[in-house]
């Protein structure tokens, strides 16, 4: 048996193929990979808009800091730890970064960025994402072998595009794939 070559996908985007369960959180999802090592992988789904949230309430910001509500769109990043909030944002904001990527993107998860966004001092572009997705060692590689995911580089312009409903279709177009290709691969029961 041959050893498998490990390719680090940190900073890449996973595009769900129709082989992923047709209902549920991963159907037509796009996942920005935060970390991918031989110990496992972590990512944030960035095209599942679920609601709007008041940053003041979510981060329990004191009244004297922010006096009014600051409503932002909230995205579901995955099925794990929905009480944790992350900002996937442009690199023009660089205070207390959790992760810094070489493609003009960063991740923060602290009170300071939420306050800065509330006061208009935050990053030019950001998505507020709750929860995350994780894989055990070898699990993501197995899913890639089963063609559950396509891998792509994507720009901050793509990630922060206005309409989250079109992002999956646009990702397929970017990869040169027509969704019709998959329709012949999936049959009826």
Swiss-Prot record:
<protein>
    <recommendedName>
        <fullName>UPF0301 protein RP032</fullName>
    </recommendedName>
</protein>
<dbReference type="InterPro" id="IPR003774">
    <property type="entry name" value="AlgH-like"/>
</dbReference>
<dbReference type="Pfam" id="PF02622">
    <property type="entry name" value="DUF179"/>
</dbReference>
<dbReference type="GO" id="GO:0005829">
    <property type="term" value="C:cytosol"/>
</dbReference>
<comment type="similarity">
    <text>Belongs to the UPF0301 (AlgH) family.</text>
</comment>
């Amino acid at each position: 048996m041959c050893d498998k070559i490990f390719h680090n996908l940190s900073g890449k985007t996973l595009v769900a193929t129709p082989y992923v369960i047709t209902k549920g959180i991963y159907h037509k999802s796009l996942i920005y990979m935060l970390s991918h090592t031989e110990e496992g992988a972590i990512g944030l789904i960035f095209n599942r808009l679920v609601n709007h949230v008041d940053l003041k309430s979510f981060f329990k910001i004191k009244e004297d800091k922010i006096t009014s509500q600051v409503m932002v769109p909230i995205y579901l990043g995955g099925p794990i730890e929905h009480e944790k909030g992350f900002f996937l944002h442009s690199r023009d904001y660089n205070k207390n970064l959790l992760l810094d990527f070489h493609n003009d993107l960063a991740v923060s998860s602290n009170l300071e960025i939420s306050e800065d966004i509330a006061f208009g001092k935050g990053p030019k572009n950001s998505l507020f994402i709750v929860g995350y997705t994780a894989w055990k060692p070898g699990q993501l590689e197995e899913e890639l072998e089963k063609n559950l995911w396509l891998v792509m580089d994507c720009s901050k312009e793509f990630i922060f595009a206005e309409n989250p409903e079109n992002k999956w279709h646009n990702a397929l177009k970017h990869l040169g794939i027509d969704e019709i290709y998959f329709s012949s691969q999936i049959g009826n029961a």
